[in-house]
Each structure stands twice: as structure tokens, then as C-alpha cells.
Amino acid sequence: MKVYAVGGAIRDTLMGLPVNDVDYVVVGSSVEEMVAQGFRPVGKDFPVFLHPETQAEYALARTERKTGKGYKGFHFYADPTVSLEEDLERRDLTINAMAQEVGPDGKWIGPIIDPYNGQEDLAAKVFRHVSDAFAEDPLRLLRIARFAARFPEFSVADETLFALKAIVQSGELSALSAERIWQELARGLVAHKPMHMFQVLLNTGAANTILPSTLSALLVEESFREGLIKSLEIAGNSLDERCAIVLMDLPASEIRSWADTIRMPIEVRDFSEIFSDLRVLINQYPDGSYQAADVLAWFNRADLWRKPDRVQMLLNLAQKLGLPVSALILAMRKAQSLNTADIIAGVEAQDRSNGERIGGAFESARLAAITAAINLDL
């Protein structure tokens, strides 16, 4: 029985990057032996165990065979006779198919085991798939796209690009779960260069399947891509902000439809939708001479009265992008400064239990405050 650290931990160590998680593979052991040594089985589809002390995950070396559609359509075979090289062969990229033995004290020992020339591709900064089985797993396309965003200095090998296109042409992308699509896209969005992820989706033909149709069409235009790169660089690495920037040229209805399809978290979806509505409002009044009723409608849509921090984030993002929102910021502050007690006191005593009358009084007061702010800004 031998234990090896494998995959991303080896890659990141060789690149001089911090290692947060380590995947361990056990060669020459069985389920019975692992349990006897105190490991707790947790894997549903293949033998994975938690270390009795560190709780780190250890997987038995395994091979796989395609039996159905999608990234779950595989039959795994784990046995003491499966070698480390056979286990590494099923991995996606050569740079992720390296290993190093782990000694009894937990320290990595001996040379890097690199049967598929991962170190060579790492030095050349190339994403190259390990074997022909690569094209059997559609999730790998999204992983490569995400890796491209994380490691923008890398290029995709020609033969790997061909394999990625084969995944798209096979129709296997339709078998991916909505949750996994969002998970990979979200990780790519907050990576170093998100545009590289979208470029992979474009180059492979996957954009039309994975992304909203309007966004896919826009990404074909070089001017849009250049503008998107600049906007993403201006914004921080907040997922909410980056997602909103990518989707800001789409109508809110299309954002909602796509977000629901890929199970985007509600708070991220709402932020993107409301920012899209803000863009519409700004474009409607390019000279900044807003109509108070339209501004109030957006404040209500953004739920300023219960979520002021979110509205502040939206306006701050617009300001960072150079959009004319000074009047809106002033209007927000004026509307927020209204005294609730004074508004209620202005309602006839007999109507103060009438929710509709109270609501109308607040709308009128807010509208007046916004009007004053807009006139002050002009």
C-alpha cells in the first residue's frame, strides 16, 4: 500500500503557488484494508475515505469506463491491482496528471512521477489532455475554460482544442447539471482573467449552448470583448459585480431566464437584473435629466428601502464604470433622509391604519425628495 499526492497540488507546488487542498490516491489497497486502518468511507460512486486524524480525502486508485451520457455516465473500477499510472491516465490534463509519494510522516518524498510529461507542458504553458478518454467527459470543457481564466498565460494545445470541439459536437454538454455549469462559470468569473474563459467557450463553439444567446452574439464582436475586458478590470473580484458586468447589456428578462436555467443564486441573479435595469434607466436619460418617477421606480425595483447597501453597491459599480449616476446618488440620499414619523404625521389620523394611504404618502414624499435632488444636480 502506497499513498501519493496527485493532481492540482503537485501542479501548484511546481508553479510556486499556495496549495490549499491536496488529493491523495492510495495504490495497492482495498476497501477492507482502508476501513481496518480507521479510514471512514464517504464516496458514493467510487471508494473515497476520510483520514481518521486529518479528515483529508483519500481515494483508491481507479480506472473508468464510459457507460452513459454526461460527466456521471462512467463506471469506476477500483482494485489493489490498479497502478498509479492507470489512475493518472484518467485525469484531464497532463499538468494535473502528476504525483509524488507521501511518506509515513505525511511529507512528500522522492521524485515527481510524471508519466504523461506534465512538467514539460507546465514549462511550455500548454493545456494538453492526457488521453482520448478526455472527450468522454463534457465537464472537462468547462474546467479547461475555467483554467484558462485562472492561468491566462497558458494556451490550449491544438489537439486538445479539437477534442473540446468534439465534446460540443457530441451534444454531451446537454447532460451537464445546471449546478455544475454555474459552479464552473462562477469560479471562472472570479479568476484572474475571466475573458479567457469566454474565449475558450467561443473557440470551441460551446458559448451558444452554455451562455445566453444575446451574450454569445455580443462576444463575437471584438469591440465588445475589449470593452468587457476593461470593465472587468475596473471592477473588483466580487462575483456579484463581475456577473453584473458580463450581463449588463442583456435585458433583465433574458438574465432571469438564463439564471433560472443554470440555477444561479438568487442574490447574484437579482444584482445582475437590477444593474441591467439601471443601465436602461441611464441610457434613457444620457444627459442626466432624469424623470423623478422613473428614478423612484428603479429605487423600488432595487428595494432601496430594505436593502440600501445593495443599491449603494450598484451605484458605486456604475460610477466605477464611468456611468453618469451623480444625480441618482444624490436622489438616493435625499430619499433616505426622509423622516418616517413626519410622513405618517402628515396623513389624516383616521387614515393611518390604511396601508394604501400610508404607502401613497411615502411614495409622494419620496417622489418630491427625488425631484428636488434631480433639480439640484442639473
Model-found features: residue ranges?
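Catalytic cores of the polymerase beta-like nucleotidyltransferase superfamily
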Residues: 1-378
